[in-house]
Amino acid sequence: MNENAMLTGKPSIDRPWMKFYPEVLRGIQVPACTVEQYLSVRAADPNVIAMHYYGVDITWGTVFRKVDVTARALQVLGVKQGDQIPVFLRSVPEFIYLLLAAERIGASLLCRDNTLEENIEAVQKANAKVIFVHDFFSKAEIEAYREQTNVNTYVIVPALESGDRAAMPVYLQHSLDALYPDVPARGSDTMMWADFCNMGQRFRGFVPAPVNIDRPLLRAYTSGSTGPSKQVIHSAHSIIGVLAQMNFYGASDKFRPTWLLTILPPALIAVVVSMMLLPLAGGMLLILDPFVDVYDVDLEMMRYRPNNWPLIPMFVEVIRRSKRLPADYDMSHMLAIGAGCEAFNNKQLRNVEEFLKQHNCNLRFTAGYGSSEAGSNATLPMAPFPVRDGNVGVPMIHSVISIFKPGTQEELTYNTPGEICMTGPGVMLGYDRPEATAKALQVHADGKTWLHTGDIGYMSEDGVLYTMTRGASPRFGGGDLMVQPLENIVADADIKGIKDEFFVIVPDDEHEGCFLPYLYVQLKDGYTLDDVRDKINACLPERYMRPVEIFTVPERPFFHFKTNRIGLSKEIIAKRNQQKEKAKRNSFADGCIA
């Protein structure tokens, strides 16, 4: 981009965000190599510690020895090029070994963390013969798989196969112990991880697959928190497309930073790419902590004092509410701090910024934008503008983001709301359903394949992306219900007594294609809805913005680490249907009396 050139009005052509990238970063290239080759650059010394897992340091030499054994064992079990390997593991070292081993043999990992029925469905579709599970896999679960799938080998990975229980604090041990069923899965079709590895060590006929960085490597289902769960497919090429653009994030030229990963499972693309592989590729020490209870993340932060810790709004809420965090606890150990997973409204941002200031963390709290389909992150916090009103940063250096008229390929100009679309090296190969892929991945007139996200937002003349809502939600009578702007209006009104608030948008059962807004508020002690209801309605300038009903919640509810809007929406619809049924019965009764 020529920074002195006049803007054409088309972000995809102007790329105004490039002015925020220093020259040294503009030279970043996306190499055409495997994930293993990309990581090997950081593994020149096999004695360097790559990961720490519950008291055990794991060197790069150990990592690649384990990968070799795992790849051989997979071939012994008959896993071939093109096969899908269902892996139902937490973020443990064995997951990384399996990912790199799958790459060596030309297979792909299949990850899902939904209901038992949905997980079984994924295995059925894959026609998998081998799956990997933890040792807290239950008898009831394995019997369901035996009845409904063609799996003939269940490889059982102990939760602490690579860790030391004695190194775990008591609260961690309790959290792990709570996962185990009364009757675990056992049988002639099960195999322990150690036996699996021994089988690989003995095998001498290993034949690696031809290198193909564009074949499927990682398949993961979306969480289903914003709609039906879909299988997203990525290759080594698309994974490295994200890693190469991000591996300077959270780094330091003065010391080797640590990177703590708590709880979040590798069933999420962002976890694998931006939270497991990124720190390894960036030369940081990855600390895996998958079995901590979400309400104990405050204790783990104090125990490890990490330099980097991928946060989500749920984690932020836990540490903010913590009664165990000393008032003088110093968070200056953090090198960068921000949150992804879902949008923050202005009230949430003010709350967390005040909290960080109280704990000597003088970093700028940032928010980013991304998706499973985008390979994780799509933006970075490079622009010096306030993180307010949906500001999620600027496109990554080799990615292009622009705004299009929804349902079309017509690019819009700056400050005009529309569908957020992107093109770049991190975009997925597609979904497992061709019709869904064709809708999401479209070749535009510029010859590039663009990902149509379904998200609504706009871009400023500086190239800063602002998110507004997910999809179009018109209200009958006029007006579009955009979640983030609605929440920010209430947040900026700073109504006395409100600690937190969020909207849930529900289909209008009387007007097809239209929607209705409901507001949930967390109130401070001593306040009731009567104290805030009129002020809420008064601050929303247009009638269509005002909620049908306002509910109170003791705290923000979460599902799959996101605000549980789907669950609350179902509750609203169920309550509405009950009221209709009751009204119908009353009407019938009145007619009988008459």
Identify the role of each PLM range:
Residues 59-61, 208, 217-243:
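Conserved AMP-binding A3 loop
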Residues 106, 240-259, 267-310, 322-324:
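Conserved AMP-binding/adenylation subdomain of ANL enzymes
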Residues 131-136, 309, 424, 429-430, ...:
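AMP-binding/adenylate-forming catalytic core of the ANL superfamily
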